[in-house]
Amino acid sequence: KEYLSKALQSLSQAAIVHTTLGPSGGYRLARAPDAVTFLDIVEAVEGKASTFVCNNIRANNPCRPGDYCETKPCAIARIMWEADEAWRAKLRSVRLSDLIVTLAAEIPANIWQSSFEWVLKRA
């Protein structure tokens, strides 16, 4: 619950959801589903920092030439940064509206209905 609460607070601060306080309060989307990407959500909750942080451990190699590690990032760092950007590009290309279409096709109507009723009982 604590993680979910913090995530929803972050989504509210990023203007992805609106918060309503009080006994009948809750959260709702602040934007249309086609205006929210998965990257918007991830960056709101986790931040915009790269998923890979290079510690330049090769600089600890006692056999390296003096400025060898300062000329360019190592191959591992470059690959990881490229992978991070590919991940972000994919998340940027998928919107909440895409998820709605996918779930509507994959989840039977009776499960949607029972889930909806379950939520209503607890609202």
What is the meaning of each model-derived region?
Residues 15-30:
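Beta-hairpin "wing" of winged helix-turn-helix
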Residues 1-18:
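Canonical helix-turn-helix DNA-binding module
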Residues 37, 50, 54-123:
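C-terminal regulatory/oligomerization modules of transcriptional regulators
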Residues 26-46:
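Charged, amphipathic alpha-helical coiled-coil/dimerization segments
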